[in-house]
Design a protein with these regions (language model features):
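Bacterial Sec-dependent N-terminal signal peptides
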Residues: 1-41
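Extended soluble regions of mature proteins
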Residues: 33-290
Length: 290
């Protein structure tokens, strides 16, 4: 496998590490003139009724988590299928896939080790199931299907306004985390960001009890023309949820060892010139704990 060198320079204190990452491998960037649909074969699986944008705030560091990060999430709600993804995760994943298609080298998304890593979700595709896609760096993009679980929501009498919509609160426990969601019956579509669904209205906000993950709607748009929901027909490692979680654990627990196992060489250097072990950085805070 083609090796690449990644240099990470950072200021080390007893509380955090500030990283500046520079890649020595070429990355193909999508532009207006060359989109993902120009690069990959694709299949239209539904048409979009509504596009909802969310701001995701998350804590990636289980050791301290004083500095939460933010990203954009987009949810395309179709007539049968819902497609939700984190903007930076999907962009990086597709850049790597495009690079692999053109050069035979996967490269690395080391810069994305601080990403939310919640995956790309197709709900009800195939019918009654999730299709979940995770980028696993040197191991490629993992894809698995699972039966759509019913989230045991309990609707309360709490109300508040989100993005101008009157919302009702609901809570549930799901795969090791407790969630509180706010949904609006003004938009009777039973979806939201990530895998969230099953309430009698659009989910406008969701937050974990511990505050590690927080989604809030920032925009709602109804397409003025036909806007297909696409599934990209590219190379995936078809696997199971159990194997994906095991791979994710290895990646987040010790990024250095994980990247080295796929032939990706790198150095980590502090401002004082010392070589630092990447294992010092703990990123393991997966969205699903069980």
């Amino acid at each position: 496998m083609h090796s690449s060198i990644i240099k990470l320079k950072g200021m080390i204190t007893n509380r955090f590490v500030l990283l500046t990452i520079s890649f020595l491998i070429p990355i193909i960037s999508f532009s207006q003139s060359k989109s993902e649909l120009d690069i990959f074969k694709h299949t239209a699986i539904d048409t979009t009724q509504l596009t909802v944008s969310y701001e995701l705030t998350f804590k990636y560091d289980i050791t301290g988590a004083e500095n939460p990060r933010q990203d954009k999430v987009y949810t395309y709600i179709g007539h049968r299928i819902c497609h939700s993804f984190v903007e930076s995760e999907r962009s990086t994943d597709l850049n790597m896939a495009a690079q692999y298609q053109e050069t035979g080298s996967r490269g690395s998304r080391a810069a994305m080790l601080l990403a939310s890593n919640v995956g790309e979700i197709y709900t009800n595709y195939p019918k009654g199931k999730f299709t979940v896609i995770y980028n696993m760096d040197g191991a490629g993009s993992y894809l698995y299907e699972e039966t759509t679980p019913k989230m045991p929501w309990k609707i309360s009498t709490e109300h508040k306004t989100v993005l101008g919509y009157n919302c009702t609160a609901a809570t549930c426990k799901y795969r090791g985390r407790e969630y509180k969601a706010w949904f609006t019956t003004d938009i009777p579509l039973s979806y939201g960001p990530w895998k969230f669904a099953g309430l009698p209205g659009l989910i406008m906000e969701v937050k974990t009890q511990d505050g590690d993950y927080h989604w809030i709607a920032t925009g709602i748009e109804k397409p003025k023309e036909v806007k297909p929901i696409y599934f990209l027909d590219r190379t995936y490692v078809k696997t199971t949820r159990e194997k994906t979680r095991k791979q994710e654990h290895l990646l987040l627990k010790d990024p250095a060892a994980y990247l080295e196992s796929y032939g990706i060489e790198f150095t980590v250097i502090s401002f004082s010139g010392e070589t630092v072990k990447l294992k010092l950085f703990t990123f393991e805070n997966p969205i699903e704990k069980e």
